[in-house]
């Protein structure tokens, strides 16, 4: 296992804090995703049967019944394990993709595997392993990353970029130097594609170009408008200075729509996941229209999964129905049609 000089109990406590704060506190960015400024032109005569609306797509070589990702959230604790289990069941039932929360803890506490091992209840979906990119500067090796992929039978590995969150954590990692060459090394080593994901502050055109240049296969832009992780860390702060530093960045980041436009300029055939402040299947449809291949949501799924299986199932179905109704009301039989639907910005 990893040589990371980390306090194992601190990792677990942080994960517990993150779940509790996200469920109980207002941690929304003061920025918006930008999608509220965009409207579809309503088609009053679509000439399409609702039952023929086709939301299917493919991702990582697997079929999706809808272009939706349950974005990475949690793992490592008993409560997180229960949440992941419910999320995986819901993803399998709906035929959508799922990302696991950061798996760094698994490298120092192998017994936490039970909180991430959901493949048995979700055998058919695209399942994404996950670790912070900065950990490549803190003793995590490509071999260990491959282990994380193998142990959960993942279809890809997410490297999340959470620089602002790390810098607003008292125990956060500060060394972000020379990461790109390490990402390239990892891309060339792994048996599965590498996905790079922001965590709520957006990817710029320049960063996207750099990542594509080293072989990253999928980009999750995760722009602002949803959870502000600096605000989460403000609630975790143990003194006034830490709280004030973290709170000052609540309006930081690139709105998701702006990030999507930037990244689409340089992405070519690289799939884009649009996440960050999306609240509905209508927002998801807007993301598809603006160039995303699939869209991700987290917060509403987390709250539903922590409550009950039935509420989570309803939440997933709500998103899908909103997407399908939007497609019909724009005259879009397929996702390709939706990508060309009339809009007003």
Swiss-Prot record:
Keywords for the protein's UniProt record, in alphabetical order: Cytoplasm, Flavoprotein, FMN, Isomerase, Isoprene biosynthesis, Magnesium, Metal-binding, NADP
Main location as per UniProt: cytoplasm
Gene: fni
Residues binding substrate: 14-15, 102-104, 165
EC number, UniProt record: 5.3.3.2
Protein name: Isopentenyl-diphosphate delta-isomerase
GO cellular component terms, A-Z: cytoplasm
GO molecular function terms listed in the Swiss-Prot or TrEMBL record: FMN binding; isopentenyl-diphosphate delta-isomerase activity; magnesium ion binding; NADPH binding; oxidoreductase activity
Function per UniProt: Involved in the biosynthesis of isoprenoids. Catalyzes the 1,3-allylic rearrangement of the homoallylic substrate isopentenyl (IPP) to its allylic isomer, dimethylallyl diphosphate (DMAPP).
Taxonomic source organism: Rickettsia felis (strain ATCC VR-1525 / URRWXCal2) (Rickettsia azadi)
Positions with a binding annotation for Mg(2+): 166
GO biological process, one term: isoprenoid biosynthetic process
Catalytic reactions of this protein: isopentenyl diphosphate = dimethylallyl diphosphate
């Amino acid at each position: 296992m990893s040589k990371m000089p980390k306090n194992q109990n601190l990792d677990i406590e942080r994960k517990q804090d993150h779940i509790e704060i996200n469920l109980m506190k207002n941690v929304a960015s003061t920025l918006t995703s930008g999608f509220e400024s965009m409207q579809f032109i309503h088609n009053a005569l679509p000439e399409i049967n609702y039952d023929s609306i086709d939301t299917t797509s493919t991702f990582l070589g697997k079929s999706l019944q809808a272009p939706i990702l349950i974005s990475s959230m949690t793992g490592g604790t008993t409560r997180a394990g229960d949440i992941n289990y419910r999320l995986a069941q819901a993803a399998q039932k709906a035929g959508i993709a799922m990302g696991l929360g950061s798996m760094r803890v698994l490298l120092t506490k192998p017994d936490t595997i039970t909180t991430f091992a959901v493949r048995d209840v979700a055998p058919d979906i695209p399942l994404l392993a996950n670790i912070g990119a900065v950990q490549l500067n803190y003793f995590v090796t490509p071999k260990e990353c491959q282990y994380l992929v193998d142990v959960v039978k993942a279809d890809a590995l997410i490297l999340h970029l959470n620089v602002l969150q790390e810098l607003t954590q008292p125990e956060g990692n500060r060394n972000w130097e020379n990461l790109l060459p390490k990402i390239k090394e990892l891309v060339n080593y792994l048996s599965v594609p590498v996905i790079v994901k922001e965590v709520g502050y957006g990817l710029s055109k320049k960063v996207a170009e750099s990542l594509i240049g080293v072989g990253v296969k999928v980009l999750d832009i995760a722009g602002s408008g949803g959870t502000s992780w600096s605000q989460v860390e403000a609630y975790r702060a143990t003194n006034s200075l830490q709280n004030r530093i973290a709170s000052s960045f609540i309006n930081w980041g690139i709105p998701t729509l702006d990030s999507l436009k930037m990244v689409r300029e340089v992405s070519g055939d690289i799939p884009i996941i649009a996440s960050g402040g999306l609240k509905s299947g209508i927002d998801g449809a807007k993301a598809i229209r603006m160039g995303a291949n699939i869209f991700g949501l987290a917060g509403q799924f987390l709250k539903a999964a922590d409550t009950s299986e039935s509420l989570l199932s309803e939440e997933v179905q709500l998103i899908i129905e909103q997407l399908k109704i939007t497609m019909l009301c724009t005259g879009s039989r397929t996702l390709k049609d939706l990508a060309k639907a009339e809009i007003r910005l």
